[in-house]
Curated annotation (Swiss-Prot):
Keywords: Acetylation, Developmental protein, DNA-binding, Isopeptide bond, Metal-binding, Methylation, Nucleus, Phosphoprotein, Repeat, Repressor, Transcription, Transcription regulation, Ubl conjugation, Wnt signaling pathway, Zinc, Zinc-finger. Residues 193-206, 368-380 have a biased composition (Pro residues). Disruption phenotype: Impaired development resulting in embryonic and perinatal lethality. Serious developmental anomalies including acrania, exencephaly, cleft palate, omphalocele and limb abnormalities. Mice disrupted in the germ line for only one allele of Hic1 develop many different spontaneous malignant tumors, including a predominance of epithelial cancers in males and lymphomas and sarcomas in females. The complete loss of Hic1 function in the heterozygous mice seems to involve dense methylation of the promoter of the remaining wild-type allele. Transmembrane segments: none annotated. Residues 241-247 are annotated as: Interaction with CTBP1. Acetylated on several residues, including Lys-333. Lys-333 is deacetylated by SIRT1. Self-associates. Interacts with HIC2. Interacts with CTBP1 and CTBP2. Interacts with TCF7L2 and ARID1A. Interacts with MTA1 and MBD3; indicative for an association with the NuRD complex. Interacts with SIRT1. It is found in: Nucleus. Residues 154-315 are annotated as: Mediates HDAC-dependent transcriptional repression. Residues 189-209, 241-421 are annotated as: Disordered. One of its GO terms (cellular component) is nucleus. The modification Phosphoserine is found at S237, S248, S366, S704. This is Hypermethylated in cancer 1 protein.
Amino acid sequence: MTFPEADILLKSGECAGQTMLDTMEAPGHSRQLLLQLNNQRTKGFLCDVIIVVQNALFRAHKNVLAASSAYLKSLVVHDNLLNLDHDMVSPAVFRLVLDFIYTGRLTDSVEAAAAAAVAPGAEPSLGAVLAAASYLQIPDLVALCKKRLKRHGKYCHLRGGGSGGGGYAPYGRPGRGLRAATPVIQACYSSPAGPPPPPAAEPPSGPDAAVNTHCAELYASGPGPAASLCAPERRCSPLCGLDLSKKSPPGSSVPERPLSERELPPRPDSPPGAGPAVYKEPSLALPPLPPLPFQKLEEAVPTPDPFRGSGGSPGPEPPGRPDGSSLLYRWMKHEPGLGSYGDELVRDRGSPGERLEERGGDPAASPGGPPLGLVPPPRYPGSLDGPGTGADGDDYKSSSEETGSSEDPSPPGGHLEGYPCPHLAYGEPESFGDNLYVCIPCGKGFPSSEQLNAHVEAHVEEEEALYGRAEAAEVAAGAAGLGPPFGGGGDKVTGAPGGLGELLRPYRCASCDKSYKDPATLRQHEKTHWLTRPYPCTICGKKFTQRGTMTRHMRSHLGLKPFACDACGMRFTRQYRLTEHMRIHSGEKPYECQVCGGKFAQQRNLISHMKMHAVGGAAGAAGALAGLGGLPGVPGPDGKGKLDFPEGVFAVARLTAEQLSLKQQDKAAAAELLAQTTHFLHDPKVALESLYPLAKFTAELGLSPDKAAEVLSQGAHLAAGPDSRTIDRFSPT
């Protein structure tokens, strides 16, 4: 039996429920969610993965990368630090790919560069993005790039290679007329609106070439004449890609005034006389702006910088404007092949900035110099000491210009360094603070690691000046057969412990036995022995023999803790730390005290516990840890640790082994247990403390108490002697 009224109410309820669900839907929820995630990425908030491309570092979220790229999904499962092949994707291209993942669109500057005519031999930006998207397996980006390239009729040219006139060289191979040291140089033009001109074999005419400021990345045209300039990218943030290079690039050239489609009033914290911040409006369609003159890429002779009002400058700089290097130095990015300052890790002394610091001068104190908090001392010629020559008169040249892995900085005429987005000069990114790098011996702080290294080298020179004559006298005396001066062996390890050299230089190098008076100077010296280690840390410069060791070392800099406890969520940087922590949850205590029977989860806790027993006798503590490697004792000539035992312990142990005819493994057990008991035999007040190890000794060896007492009584008188000796671990054989 049915009730029509009930059916009507049920249907009306379903309709009302459907209407309620429709009203709860937020059409722009997914877009807002991506926008919030992108904001968190730019601020480094809750980022759980770091992608390293060349010398640039990018923070991101694992879930977002795994949902967008099948290739990245397979990587983020296993590690929190990813290294991408820089032959397949460059830092500038990966920045665009990461922006697409978080926003769903490519920037206008890339589309304009792909739509504009490019010089023969140069590769289009959109083609590089397509190659990177294919490598990272991002199908949406691949489809978008192919669609845009087909629209402009350039997809077939990419397939055909660079053999034809107007075609483009494949990604990763330099075109004709380009040097191999600049594999990622791209052309960028400003024609956001209007039909693109057809590609021609002849490059655009003009007296100069063009430089584009693309979020602290450099995009320079080929060696041909000029093109026009592309506006900076809108969403520029240095947090998207942080530079891990040890050395900073030069800030010797800066445009007279940033080109912009729309100007904003200067920021309140802007330096006096600085230009306004700029950004690009999406709806604007302006004609191409006139190019700026600059040094040609192929010109190897350094000349005065045209951007600083000298040589061919369009005009002098406005008075009161700060030096361009002081504004742009910190935020210049390293593009592969454009001044590979990131590849150098241990710099020989001799650059102008280092010599200035070694002489005791402060860069902030020099008149007309950049402020200390913003710019380190310039390391390139042509910035302070004149064009092309350092402080000691040596010319700076690129050591491997044609291979792309230069060890030394290139001259200003050889490579052009990048310019950041204009608002980066006003200090908008997060503040890292001043003087974070502190010299341990003197406590002086510096804003950059290269200034600290130069300062430490000044300590080395000062030390050599103070003790150079003493070392020379020692060498001369040793050659004459008179022995080292001061009668104490100088500062060698074999000298007397109380020698003058031992007191003045207590820190020694394990490789060459050189000694220094502070650990910071010793670490600086140890870097000279790292030449055979091919894997350097791009943050501190330390080198390693294996890539895995370098990756684990970088976790300490980046704050990565990939090993997490499943029980409590606590994270660790090393696997063995997690193993020790898991014993807290499992209750496992593998380390046992052989004196009192106490058990511990970690070996360091047992060592601390044995120090308590060492108050009554140091021999008992050392013997209890004989099976665990022993306490750290006095190292001998072979580098092995020694243990201090009373003289009678070895006599009793050897006597016990001979009379009981023990096996090899039983002899070691007898030596350990006797070392724990015999030092108590001469003191009747503490005789009860020996009951536990003695009972354990008899139980393990299967001896009766009478037999054990008889053996111990024969050697007990030897244990009463106060003398002790330091020998190797006891071996009954």
